[in-house]
Amino acid sequence: MPTIKQLIRNTRQPIRNVTKSPALGGCPQRRGTCTRVYSGSKGDLSVNFSTITPKKPNSALRKVARVRLTSGFEITAYIPGIGHNSQEHSVVLVRGGRVKDLPGVRYHIVRGTLDAVGVKDRQQGRSQYGVKKPK
């Protein structure tokens, strides 16, 4: 417990709120342009194809893209769902939300908006993947 003299000398510092998605700048989503899309197969690792592999206990080839946001930040965003059509220069919508087993990936691409199409043949949990209700 500080003395009154110590409190006069140095006031109490307020607890600063640190954002987990600084590139969004307080907005729920941001538009951006893909500068590079990382995907590919385990056998074929050519110069323009790279893959992001998850941390230790998991093993996969996760699909991510480098996105230049309208806020000026260049970020790495995860592409959820099976299959995607994102290429370089695709315009995408980015939301917050990290991927636990991919270090440095703190954003998700929103499927079903702008140039990112929804997941094909998805029946359950469609809202997260931009799929309309089947007739």
UniProtKB/Swiss-Prot annotation:
Signal peptide: none annotated. It comes from Populus trichocarpa (Western balsam poplar). Its main location: plastid. With S4 and S5 plays an important role in translational accuracy. Located at the interface of the 30S and 50S subunits. It is found in: Plastid, Chloroplast. This is Small ribosomal subunit protein uS12cy. One of its GO terms (molecular function) is structural constituent of ribosome. One of its GO terms (biological process) is translation. Keywords: Chloroplast, Plastid, Ribonucleoprotein, Ribosomal protein, RNA-binding, rRNA-binding. SUPFAM superfamilies: Nucleic acid-binding proteins (SSF50249). Belongs to the universal ribosomal protein uS12 family. Part of the 30S ribosomal subunit. GO terms for cellular component: chloroplast; ribosome; small ribosomal subunit. Pfam families: Ribosom_S12_S23. It comes from the Eukaryota.
